[in-house]
Regions:
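Conserved nucleic-acid-binding Ia/Ib motif block in the N-terminal RecA-like helicase ATPase lobe
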Residues: 1-61, 69-72, 182-200, 209
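Post-DEXD/H (motif II) to motif III coupling segment of the RecA-like Helicase ATP-binding lobe
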Residues: 15, 19-20, 65-137, 276, ...
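A short beta-strand element within the Helicase C-terminal
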Residues: 69, 230-245, 267-271
Length: 353
């Protein structure tokens, strides 16, 4: 049983497991997904269950998960899973797991203490934070941190100027409130800039579509709450922008962890208002000079098509490629990332087509 704090992380882990564990039954359970489909899949005990605390607790409450056969529990991003907002569900999940022989807790940030209900007996800690082999760099080494001062409390114009100064690349902008995410996105959209919003107040399909368009380069910009800070593996994120200051060092670490991945380099920018002070954990940031004449903003190279059919309708990537090449007269190299969900699919194609 693998527990994760967000739907997107559950889907990501489910996708990876299906690639490396072909032939093994896996069930993914999360809010916004069909309870009926999950219940049907759980009727015959799977080898792996991946899910979010609320949905897993609900299935356990209703007797849909066979607890006697569970022998391994994994808490990914455990410090978040065990935070106050999830503790009731987590206690409800862990308490009846009498036959679990192994508990594995993973995160990029440590936790000073663990709730008693985790019932860890003589835990062994493996700490890879900051460790390296000879001649090997860590993500922190490959991350350049910059400071930008906004002359007024409203940072929108400063953000816009920064975006014009960045060469094309995937850019994650972090805000502390959902309303701010929507406001920043609307500001950019009103100026003809393609940008996606991503936060917990959006419907599941809208969240999946936003991440898909960001991953497949239909949008270079995604504005998000800290929902996007943990665990999500979005390749090639070049820039992190802290529109709002992180609430703490852990948030800062997880936000920045979306870039400088897999030996790539990344850049993070902190925008400070007139009365804001740089946090102690970011005092090494270098001042970034805005060039008012710079204009590197470009329209993304891809656009996303939506197909109203997915896995449950037996649609494959080959079906979509065949349709686009035969009916749409597209060349194979004009088709980008294809993502097939349960009942719908997304495909990126070159925008000029």
């Amino acid at each position: 049983l693998v527990i994760v704090p967000s739907r997107e992380l559950a889907l990501q882990i489910d996708n990876v497991l299906r690639k490396i564990a072909a032939g093994i039954k896996i069930v993914c359970c999360y809010g916004g997904h069909s309870v009926r489909e999950e219940s049907k899949s759980l009727a015959v005990a799977p080898a792996l269950i991946v899910g979010t605390p609320g949905r897993i607790a609900d299935h356990i409450r209703r007797g849909r998960i066979v607890l006697e056969t569970l022998d391994t529990l994994v808490l990914d991003e455990f410090d978040k899973c065990l935070a106050l907002g999830f503790q009731d569900e987590m206690q409800e999940i862990i308490a009846p797991l009498k036959n679990v022989k192994k508990k594995i807790l993973t995160s990029a940030t440590d936790s000073e203490s663990l709730p008693a209900f985790t019932a860890l007996k003589k835990p062994v800690k493996l700490n890879f934070l900051g460790s390296r082999k000879d001649n090997e760099t860590t993500p922190t080494d490959r991350l350049s941190l910059y400071r930008i001062d906004s002359p007024i409390k409203d940072k929108l114009e400063t953000l816009l100027a920064l975006l014009h100064n960045l060469k094309p690349g995937l850019t994650l902008i972090f805000c502390n409130q959902r309303e701010s995410v929507d406001r920043v996105r609307q500001f950019l959209t009103d100026r003809g800039i393609i940008a996606e919003a991503f936060h917990g107040g959006m419907g599941q399909a809208d969240r999946e579509r936003a991440l898909c368009k960001f991953r497949n380069h239909s949008s270079y910009i995604c504005i998000s709450t800290d929902l996007a800070a943990r665990g999500l593996d979005i390749p090639e994120v070049k820039y992190i922008v802290h529109y709002h200051l992180p609430v703490d060092f852990e948030s800062f670490t997880h936000r920045n962890g979306r870039t400088a991945r897999m030996h790539a380099e990344g850049e993070a920018f902190i925008i400070l208002g007139p009365t804001e002070q740089m946090p102690e954990y970011a005092t090494e940031a270098t001042d970034f000079r805005i060039d008012p004449k710079a204009d590197f903003l470009q329209t993304p190279p891809m656009a996303t098509f939506h197909f109203a059919a997915g896995k449950k309708e037996k649609i494959s990537k080959g079906d979509i490629v065949g349709f686009l090449t035969q009916k749409g007269k597209l060349a194979a190299d004009e088709i980008g990332l294809i993502e097939i969900k349960d009942h719908y699919s997304y495909v990126a194609v070159t925008r000029d087509k």
